[in-house]
């Protein structure tokens, strides 16, 4: 597996505009019990992106989990959740803030804008922003794309129809999505995306890249579901059995969040 030490993740804390308190799957909290939202996103394929667009020069901060650290057991154990969030995710936030220090225009961007404009970042900080900005966006969404078993709902009729059209059935989608995650060599992510014409597609990315990074990751669409397949996401519980982690992960997928992003 990919050596995570190459990504320089410190073990101490952040601070940032909160990611405005909830990676958007937040602004609709008043309208949905899951706290998921769809906010319009300029210059992207569809108005699906869930992240807020508010401007500020405050530092990014580590978002709170929408559930207890042990709430996803036995699929994801509490120790893994704690280390994953307070060490790995926290490190991405810390390193992103360091990279953006002295760049007030970039500090005024939301994290979705940073990802969308990743290919135009200054050369001196581009790699650091790509690794750590991607890591912050990806993890903030990952926490929202999960929910305690039995509380995440099921794919909506509209999403089910789109999955069936693209992959044959919802169950066949799960098989192909898991295959994308298993097939990702080293570290990375598996994604379900919505394209401009309303169809859905599966892709995977290396390291902390995501489909919002136009010019770096192209041809997939706007992400509506993502699964972390870095070893730190599962190794304590599943060791090297990534397929077992991906098979169990469906028990804690927050379909209510995915449905809201697809609608």
Feature names for model-found ranges:
Residues 82, 90, 129-151, 221-241:
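Short, contiguous alpha-helical
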Residues 57-124:
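Near-N-terminal "mature-domain entry" segment
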Residues 1-18, 41:
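N-terminal secretory signal peptides
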Residues 15-31:
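N-terminal export leaders
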Residues 87, 98-107, 113, 120-194, ...:
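All-alpha RGS (Regulator of G-protein Signaling) helical domain and cognate RGS-like helical scaffolds
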Residues 34-72:
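C-terminal segment of N-terminal export signals and the immediately downstream linker at the start
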Residues 62, 89, 136, 192, ...:
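Divalent metal-coordination and catalytic microenvironments
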Residues 179-239, 247-253:
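An amphipathic alpha-helical core segment
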